[in-house]
Each structure stands twice: as C-alpha cells, then as structure tokens.
Amino acid sequence: MSSTAVPRPKPWETSASLEEPQRNAQSLSAMMTSNQQDSRPTEESNNSNSASESAPEVLPRPAALNSSGTYGESNTIPGIYGNSNYGIPYDNNPYSMNSIYGNSIGRYGYGGSYYGNNYGSFYGGGYGAGAGYGMNNGSGLGESTKATFQLIESLIGAVTGFAQMLESTYMATHNSFFTMISVAEQFGNLKEMLGSFFGIFAIMKFLKKILYRATKGRLGIPPKNFAESEGSKNKLIEDFQKFNDSGTINSNEKATRRKISWKPLLFFLMAVFGFPYLLNKFITKLQTSGTIRASQGNGSEPIDPSKLEFARALYDFVPENPEMEVALKKGDLMAILSKKDPLGRDSDWWKVRTKNGNIGYIPYNYIEIIKRRKKIEHVDDETRTH
C-alpha cells in the first residue's frame, strides 16, 4: 500500500498559493486607483481656484515686440519629448503605476522623473524650458558678447577708413604730380609754337631793316640803335618841356599815386575768422535738426513731467522677451512713458518705467492708471485768512 499511495501535494503547488500573488497585485492596483480617484477632485478644485484668481489673457503683442524673439523661447523640444509623446502616453499605459511593473517603465522610465516631462529631474535641465537651451540662455550669451564685437568692428572700420584716406591722398598726390608734368609739357609745346610763329615776324623785320639801309631810309624800318637814339632825343625834349610847365619832372607821378586800400585786408580777415565761425554754426544747427528728426522717427516724444501718468500693477506679469518687456509684481508702481509701440503706432502694449528703473513694454490690461487729484488753490487763501 505504501507503493500505491498518492504523494502529498507540495505547498507551492496548491491553487491557493498560486492565487495569492494575483490577489495581492489586484488589491495593490485597486488601492492605487482609489488614491488617484481621491486625489483628482482635490487637484480639480485647486485648478479651479487658481483659474479664478489668475490674471487676464495677455493681449496679442505687436510685430515690433515679436521681432526680437529667440530660439530659446520655443517649446518645440519640450513638446516632443516632454508631456506629449513620451510623458503622458507611457505614464498612463498598462505598465504605469497601476500595474505590477508601474514604477519601472511608467514613472522612472519615460514617464515622470528620468526622461518624461522635459527629461524629468536628472535630464530635465538639458532641453527643457528651465536651463540649457531654454529661456534665452543662448541669446543672453550673444547679447553679452555683442558689445565686444561691435567695439572690434568699429576699430576695424576706423583702421579701414584711415587706410582708405591714405590711399586717396596718395592717388590725389600722384594725379596732381602728373597733371603738373603734363601742364609743363603743354607750356613747352606752346613756347615752341609761339617761337615758330614769331620767327616769321623776325624774318620780316630783318628784311625791312635791310630794305631801309638799301633805300637810305625811304623804305623799311630803321635799325634798333638808330630808333633808340631818335627816341631818347625826343624824350629829352619832352621832359624839358614838362619841366618848364610844372617845374618838376615827377609831378605827374605823384598825382597818379593811389591811396592804400583797406578792403583786401578786411576781406582776408573775414575769410580767415568769419568763415570757420559760420561753418561751426551751420554744423551745430544740422546736428540739432538731425537729432530731432531721429527722435521723431523713433516715435519718442519729449516727456513732460506735468503730464506724466502713473499706474499700479493689478496682476503679476512674466515677460516672454525680457529685452523688450518688463516684469511686474502685483502692486508695483510705474510711470507710463508712451502708449505707442516702438514703430510709433498706437498699441495695447505701453512703455513704462518701474521704481527700480526698469524700462519696457507691458499690456495695458495688467495695470490701473492712478488718477491725479486736482489742486485746489483757494484752500491756501482760506487757511491764511484764518
């Protein structure tokens, strides 16, 4: 009977022992689902309360403010690897928190901590909205080095301008030198031409002198020595007659002397001192008019302190573009500088200056204008009488 006896079943082969892990897993999943259902109403209530106290919708930004946005503000990578593809789908799948393998793939795999929601906590700073390439860190580096590169560019421009000035001076000197050489050559050619032209008259004069000697003074012209002797005799006779008439030979020369004129000296002084003064005045006037035109072109108007408006922030405002916009806290005071956009057009985004000295644009529905109290001048008179 001992050989035909049925062996006793082992403890792990019983149905109760096999069903026990399944019951534990089902109870664990039921507890987790109940916890999630209990937490959802509280989250919905919190979201409803925060929505009721949230700020109004931000007005659409003008094109002038959106033109300076950077790639750091876009949410392309967080949308792909964050809450859309790898965050929520893998978090709510059968392998998430509600199953036996919930903490392996759902929360720590692709769901919540490591790679989900902008790569989670360990890898979240890489491509999310907080650090790395997010929120203007790349543009901030570019802006910090922008002034240095502008300085280097200005230095290179100055050196290039100086080199161009030297080159233009050299070319002007070169051209003027060869121009003078060409002018000298032209004068030489003119001299040769005049010499050849007047040579004909010299030959004719020589022939007339020969004719004068051949005809014994009847034809032709007398020689030079004979003409000078005849002319000197005539001049002596004329001088003697003048001496008899006026008593002095140089009386006519004294009469013909001119008085010294001061006009050339005055014109010279006016050209030396007056012209630079007038030129300086003209340049100053041009600079003033240019500054006024530039300010009008930029849409900036002169600020009148008596007409300046003040406002108070009603809600917190976080700027998307810190270069053009300014951050606000509820209750902050500010002065409204302009109600126009950078292009000078009327806009819903106003330019303000906070108490901290920050200047930027904000939507007008986030602030409240503080009305000024009218001054009552006759009150002072009444107090004086009492």
Swiss-Prot record:
Biased composition (Low complexity): 44-55
Bias-annotated ranges (Polar residues): 23-39, 65-76
Key words of the record: Membrane, Peroxisome, Protein transport, SH3 domain, Translocation, Transmembrane, Transmembrane helix, Transport
InterPro entries reported in the protein's UniProt record: Peroxin-13_N (IPR007223), Pex13 (IPR035463), SH3-like_dom_sf (IPR036028), SH3_domain (IPR001452)
Domain SH3: 306-372
Membrane topology reported for the UniProt record: Single-pass membrane protein
Localization: Peroxisome membrane
Gene Ontology molecular function, alphabetical: protein transmembrane transporter activity; protein-macromolecule adaptor activity
Oligomeric and partner information: Interacts (via SH3 domain) with PEX14 (via SH3-binding motif); forming the PEX13-PEX14 docking complex.
Protein name according to UniProt: Peroxisomal membrane protein PEX13
Organism listed in the record: Saccharomyces cerevisiae (strain ATCC 204508 / S288c)
The gene coding this protein: PEX13
